[in-house]
Protein backbone atom coordinates (compact mmCIF):
# COMPACT_ATOMS: atom_id res chain seq x y z
CA UNK A 1 0.00 0.00 0.00
CA UNK A 2 1.28 3.49 -0.81
CA UNK A 3 0.56 6.48 1.45
CA UNK A 4 0.82 10.05 0.14
CA UNK A 5 0.65 12.70 2.86
CA UNK A 6 -1.40 15.82 2.17
CA UNK A 7 -0.36 19.47 2.50
CA UNK A 8 2.36 20.00 5.14
CA UNK A 9 2.35 16.45 6.49
CA UNK A 10 5.19 13.94 6.26
CA UNK A 11 5.47 10.18 6.66
CA UNK A 12 8.29 9.08 9.00
CA UNK A 13 9.75 5.64 9.70
CA UNK A 14 11.01 5.67 13.28
CA UNK A 15 14.68 4.69 13.68
CA UNK A 16 15.54 2.01 16.22
CA UNK A 17 16.14 3.33 19.73
CA UNK A 18 19.54 2.91 21.34
CA UNK A 19 19.24 0.10 23.88
CA UNK A 20 22.46 0.97 25.75
CA UNK A 21 23.26 4.06 27.76
CA UNK A 22 26.41 6.10 27.09
CA UNK A 23 28.04 4.14 29.95
CA UNK A 24 27.21 0.79 28.33
CA UNK A 25 24.27 -0.13 30.58
CA UNK A 26 21.53 -2.07 28.77
CA UNK A 27 18.23 -0.18 28.99
CA UNK A 28 14.91 -2.00 29.45
CA UNK A 29 11.27 -1.14 30.03
CA UNK A 30 10.41 2.54 30.31
CA UNK A 31 14.10 3.52 30.27
CA UNK A 32 14.30 2.22 26.69
CA UNK A 33 11.92 4.86 25.34
CA UNK A 34 10.93 5.00 21.69
CA UNK A 35 13.31 6.90 19.45
CA UNK A 36 12.39 10.42 18.38
CA UNK A 37 14.54 10.11 15.26
CA UNK A 38 13.30 8.82 11.98
CA UNK A 39 13.67 8.86 8.22
CA UNK A 40 11.25 10.75 5.97
CA UNK A 41 9.62 8.30 3.54
CA UNK A 42 7.07 10.64 1.89
CA UNK A 43 6.12 14.33 1.96
CA UNK A 44 3.05 16.36 1.07
CA UNK A 45 3.00 19.17 -1.51
CA UNK A 46 3.45 21.93 1.07
CA UNK A 47 1.62 24.29 3.38
CA UNK A 48 -1.20 26.34 1.88
CA UNK A 49 -0.68 30.00 2.83
CA UNK A 50 -3.47 32.52 3.49
CA UNK A 51 -3.03 33.97 -0.01
CA UNK A 52 -3.51 30.52 -1.59
CA UNK A 53 0.14 29.96 -2.50
CA UNK A 54 1.82 26.70 -1.53
CA UNK A 55 5.03 26.89 0.52
CA UNK A 56 7.19 23.81 -0.21
CA UNK A 57 8.38 21.79 2.77
CA UNK A 58 11.92 22.16 4.15
CA UNK A 59 12.34 18.38 4.47
CA UNK A 60 12.60 15.81 1.70
CA UNK A 61 12.40 12.04 1.33
CA UNK A 62 15.47 10.41 2.86
CA UNK A 63 16.15 13.12 5.46
CA UNK A 64 16.84 11.85 8.98
CA UNK A 65 14.96 14.05 11.42
CA UNK A 66 14.42 14.59 15.14
CA UNK A 67 10.72 15.00 15.86
CA UNK A 68 8.32 15.77 18.66
CA UNK A 69 5.71 13.02 18.83
CA UNK A 70 3.04 15.27 20.21
CA UNK A 71 -0.61 16.09 19.78
CA UNK A 72 -0.82 15.87 15.98
CA UNK A 73 1.18 12.66 15.49
CA UNK A 74 -0.70 9.67 14.08
CA UNK A 75 0.77 6.15 14.10
CA UNK A 76 -0.22 3.78 11.30
CA UNK A 77 0.82 0.19 10.61
CA UNK A 78 1.32 -0.22 6.87
CA UNK A 79 2.63 -3.43 5.32
CA UNK A 80 3.79 -4.64 8.78
CA UNK A 81 5.76 -1.43 9.30
CA UNK A 82 4.94 1.24 11.89
CA UNK A 83 4.95 4.71 10.35
CA UNK A 84 4.18 8.14 11.79
CA UNK A 85 2.19 10.85 10.04
CA UNK A 86 3.42 14.22 11.35
CA UNK A 87 2.96 17.87 10.53
CA UNK A 88 6.18 19.48 9.37
CA UNK A 89 5.97 21.73 12.44
CA UNK A 90 6.46 18.61 14.63
CA UNK A 91 9.95 18.20 13.14
CA UNK A 92 12.55 19.86 15.35
CA UNK A 93 15.72 19.31 13.29
CA UNK A 94 17.31 17.60 10.30
CA UNK A 95 20.30 15.38 11.16
CA UNK A 96 23.16 16.07 8.75
Curated annotation (Swiss-Prot):
Instruction: Tell me which Pfam families the record gives.
Output: Cpn10 (PF00166)
* Protein name according to UniProt: Co-chaperonin GroES
**What organism does the record attribute this protein to?**
Buchnera aphidicola subsp. Schizaphis graminum (strain Sg)
Q: Which family does it belong to?
A: Belongs to the GroES chaperonin family.
From which domain of life does this come? Bacteria
Q: Does the keyword Cytoplasm apply?
A: yes
An example of a GO molecular function for this protein is: metal ion binding
This chain is encoded by the gene named groES
Q: Where in the cell is it found?
A: Cytoplasm
Please provide the record's keywords in A-Z order.
Answer: Chaperone, Cytoplasm
Amino acid sequence: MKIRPLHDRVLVKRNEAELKSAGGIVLTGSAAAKSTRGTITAVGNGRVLDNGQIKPLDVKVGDVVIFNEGYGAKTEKIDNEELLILNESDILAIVE
